[in-house]
């Protein structure tokens, strides 16, 4: 067997084993050194793939695909700086526990650190952000093929383990790269003959859910029974099953549940919009939780954390599926590594016949009702569409089984705060890049999320984040499902207008707000994507309704000013705080 045959077979086995492990979607970036892997993907009838000229975009697309499927998409690139372009998406995947597998082609050993062209130190380049990094040997008939298959199996195991995350396999190749069919009866293949004849991977892996210890359930139940004002928090939850279980627990016990947008429960009619209350100083003067059970990961808003710092609850429990640390204020008293669903189910069984102290539910309900009526004023048909009404209207119009992706900065905060709760159960697939909370790669991630879901996805994004990932619009032409992109164009970084630096007029506009004067419509036209620019809430709702019924991607641009947005937010918040004072007098 010659070198071309060995290299071709080596690559075919790697790709085939990944597919047998259920990792059959490949994000390919063109390059010479990665030719054997690319050809192996292209010629495998079971492989699904998409080609990306930009590795940075590919990395975020793979991230979005994993968010939708729970399985790692496979990234393949050539040697050199190509693999470094994955770094931002690797950080996000690592921080937010999303599976990812990178196969980076590399120069062989004899060319490393010699000044050879397009040769860098690739092995271990992602440092602590990878769950496992490993350099495969150069293809050789001296290497047992079982060891190659076993390495691939372990890569999948680490990428999908607890916690999931990125895995980096460095795959060196010597020239020539051009494919050549090999003789499958060669003695080198004899030890894996059974594998060749089957459709199974060499080794499967299994990950069990963390079952809560009965003693921990009992302790938690006792703490809740002894509490005067308990609070449940649902942070980022990884599954619909987790969300349903946590929502059922809170509803059955009558304990307030702060449901973050990332929990999947924010749209549930069973959950009150506690975001409105926790932004009200007047409300927090009267509601001071003395015991908190926090399910899942981090929150979008800083206000619950600030309120808890003030109330100093004697017990703050965090229930999360892995041992990753969550204690940004260093006030967690018990960290519980367990499945949120299994923990919530067990806790409900323990407490279902227990009478708990009543809290002022009717007063709070009245406050929430009137507060949401104030938000609805901003959504009146003939009013100009605003960042507040965008969140409210999109939350109402998103289809029952569609996807929603929220960009960082203001869009995700507005949706968390102003969304309308219109669903009995959490059916909308909601995603966001909140691991490291950057604005980079948002369009690419949303496109990957839609591809993974195989459902239409609505993306709400600011103008700066849109421009940051503009080349991702090229992905939509070959997409199998539409992406509806709502661009909130306030001519710059709107979130900075809410920060104290906005008062420093001599530096704010040029160094922080960074106004841009590019045409969003022209950008969309360049990539052949439809564009609309509604001016009123009625026009926006009609445009969204039409877009949501179409199978075509579209950019819907909402223009406004940062100054008007800050004024509207502060005015609405003042009104809500006044409502809190009014209704709290009834207690």
From Swiss-Prot:
Catalytic activity: isochorismate + 2-oxoglutarate + H(+) = 5-enolpyruvoyl-6-hydroxy-2-succinyl-cyclohex-3-ene-1-carboxylate + CO2
Metal-binding keyword on record: yes
One Pfam family here: TPP_enzyme_C
Top-level taxon in the UniProt lineage: Bacteria
Cofactor list: Mg(2+); Mn(2+); thiamine diphosphate
GO BP term, pick one: menaquinone biosynthetic process
Enzyme class: transferase
Cofactor, free-text remark: Binds 1 thiamine pyrophosphate per subunit.
Entry annotated with the keyword Manganese: yes
Pathway in which this enzyme or protein is active: Quinol/quinone metabolism; 1,4-dihydroxy-2-naphthoate biosynthesis; 1,4-dihydroxy-2-naphthoate from chorismate: step 2/7; Quinol/quinone metabolism; menaquinone biosynthesis
GO molecular function list: 2-succinyl-5-enolpyruvyl-6-hydroxy-3-cyclohexene-1-carboxylic-acid synthase activity; magnesium ion binding; manganese ion binding; thiamine pyrophosphate binding
EC number, as in UniProt: 2.2.1.9
PANTHER family membership: 2-SUCCINYL-5-ENOLPYRUVYL-6-HYDROXY-3-CYCLOHEXENE-1-CARBOXYLATE SYNTHASE, PROTEIN PHYLLO, CHLOROPLASTIC
Subunit record text: Homodimer.
Role noted for this protein: Catalyzes the thiamine diphosphate-dependent decarboxylation of 2-oxoglutarate and the subsequent addition of the resulting succinic semialdehyde-thiamine pyrophosphate anion to isochorismate to yield 2-succinyl-5-enolpyruvyl-6-hydroxy-3-cyclohexene-1-carboxylate (SEPHCHC).
NCBIfam families: menD
Sequence similarity: Belongs to the TPP enzyme family. MenD subfamily.
Matching HAMAP family: MenD (MF_01659)
Protein's recorded name: 2-succinyl-5-enolpyruvyl-6-hydroxy-3-cyclohexene-1-carboxylate synthase
Organism of this sequence: Chlorobium phaeobacteroides (strain DSM 266 / SMG 266 / 2430)
């Amino acid at each position: 067997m010659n070198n071309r045959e060995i290299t071709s077979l080596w690559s075919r086995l790697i790709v085939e084993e990944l597919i047998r492990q259920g990792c059959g979607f490949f994000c390919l970036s063109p390059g010479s050194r990665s030719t054997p892997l690319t050809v192996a993907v292209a010629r495998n009838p079971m492989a699904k793939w998409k080609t990306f000229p930009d590795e940075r975009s590919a990395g975020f697309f793979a991230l979005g695909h994993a968010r939708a499927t729970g399985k790692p998409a496979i990234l393949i690139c050539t040697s050199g700086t190509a693999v470094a372009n994955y770094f931002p998406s690797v950080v996000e995947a690592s921080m937010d526990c999303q599976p990812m597998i990178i196969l980076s082609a590399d120069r062989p050993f004899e060319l490393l650190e010699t000044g050879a062209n397009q040769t860098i130190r690739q092995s271990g380049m992602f440092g602590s952000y990878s769950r496992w990094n490993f350099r495969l040997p150069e293809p050789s008939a001296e290497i047992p093929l079982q060891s190659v298959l076993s390495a691939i199996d372990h890569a999948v195991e680490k990428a999908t383990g607890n916690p999931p995350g990125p895995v980096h396999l460095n795959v060196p190749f010597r020239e020539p790269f051009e494919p050549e069919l090999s003789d499958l009866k060669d003695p080198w293949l004899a030890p894996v003959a059974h594998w060749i004849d089957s459709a199974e991977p060499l080794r499967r892996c299994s990950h069990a859910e963390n079952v809560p210890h009965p003693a921990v359930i009992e302790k938690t139940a006792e703490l809740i029974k002894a509490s005067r004002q308990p609070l449940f928090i649902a942070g980022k939850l990884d599954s619909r099953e987790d969300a349903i279980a946590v929502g059922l627990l809170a509803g059955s016990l009558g304990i307030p549940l702060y449901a973050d947008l990332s929990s999947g429960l924010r749209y549930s009619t069973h959950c009150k919009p506690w975001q409105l209350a926790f932004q009200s100083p007047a409300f927090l003067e009267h509601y001071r939780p003395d015991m908190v059970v926090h399910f899942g990961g981090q929150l979008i808003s800083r206000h619950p954390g600030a309120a808890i710092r003030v109330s100093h609850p004697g017990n703050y429990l965090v229930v999360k599926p892995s041992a990753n640390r969550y204690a940004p204020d260093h006030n967690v008293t018990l960290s519980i590594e367990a499945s949120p669903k299994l923990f919530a189910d067990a806790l409900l069984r323990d407490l279902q016949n227990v009478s708990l102290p009543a809290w002022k539910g009717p007063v709070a309900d009245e406050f929430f009702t009137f507060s949401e009526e104030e938000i609805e004023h901003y959504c009146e048909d003939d009013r100009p569409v605003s960042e507040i009404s965008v969140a409210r209207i999109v939350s109402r119009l998103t289809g029952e089984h569609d996807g929603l992706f929220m960009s960082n900065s203001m869009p995700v905060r507005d949706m968390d705060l102003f969304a309308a709760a219109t669903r009995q159960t959490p059916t909308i697939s909601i995603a966001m890049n909140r691991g490291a909370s950057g604005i980079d790669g948002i369009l690419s991630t949303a496109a990957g999320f839609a591809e993974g879901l195989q459902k239409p996805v609505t993306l709400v994004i600011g103008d700066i984040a849109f421009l940051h990932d503009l080349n991702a619009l090229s992905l939509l032409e070959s997409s199998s499902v539409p992406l509806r992109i709502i661009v909130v164009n306030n001519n710059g970084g709107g979130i900075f207008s809410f920060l104290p630096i906005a008062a420093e007029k001599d530096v704010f506009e040029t160094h922080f707000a960074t106004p841009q004067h590019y045409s969003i419509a022209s950008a969309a036209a360049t990539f052949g994507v439809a564009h609309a620019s509604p001016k009123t809430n009625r026009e926006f709702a009609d445009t969204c309704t039409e877009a949501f019924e179409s199978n075509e991607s579209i950019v819907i641009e909402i223009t406004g000013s940062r100054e008007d947005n800050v004024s509207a937010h502060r005015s609405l918040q003042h009104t809500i705080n006044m409502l809190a004072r009014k209704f709290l007098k009834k207690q």
